[in-house]
């Protein structure tokens, strides 16, 4: 009987140790889940902050470039006007010579 009682105590001791181990595992699992949830929330917060920052940068760049496009258009119009005036001036200065050359070519008879 003594051996029976000893084995009963051993079994009870093992069952108690198994339950304690199960509690430890469950506590560790719960802690891990809590840490994972917290890490996920922190990551989502950082992502949202970064997204907001990048959106603000993009909007600022759009405002700067769209504001500059009006100035660029005006500058290009001025440059184009200046080039047209320059070409007109050059054309006026050589138009007499071109007319004379054309008249000479038309009126000269070649055999």
From Swiss-Prot:
The reply on keyword Transport is yes
Please give an example of a GO cellular component term from this record: vacuolar proton-transporting V-type ATPase, V1 domain
Q: Does the keyword Ion transport apply?
A: yes
Q: Which GO molecular function, any one, fits this protein according to its record? A: proton-transporting ATPase activity, rotational mechanism
Q: Which domain of life is it from?
A: Eukaryota
- Which keywords are on file for this protein? Hydrogen ion transport, Ion transport, Transport
InterPro entries according to UniProt: V-ATPase_G
Q: What is annotated about its quaternary structure and interactions?
A: V-ATPase is a heteromultimeric enzyme composed of a peripheral catalytic V1 complex (components A to H) attached to an integral membrane V0 proton pore complex (components: a, c, c', c'' and d).
Family according to the record: Belongs to the V-ATPase G subunit family.
What role does it play? Catalytic subunit of the peripheral V1 complex of vacuolar ATPase (V-ATPase). V-ATPase is responsible for acidifying a variety of intracellular compartments in eukaryotic cells.
Which NCBIfam families did the record assign?
Answer: V_ATP_synt_G
Q: What is this protein called?
A: V-type proton ATPase subunit G 2
Q: What is the lineage of its organism?
A: Eukaryota, Viridiplantae, Streptophyta, Embryophyta, Tracheophyta
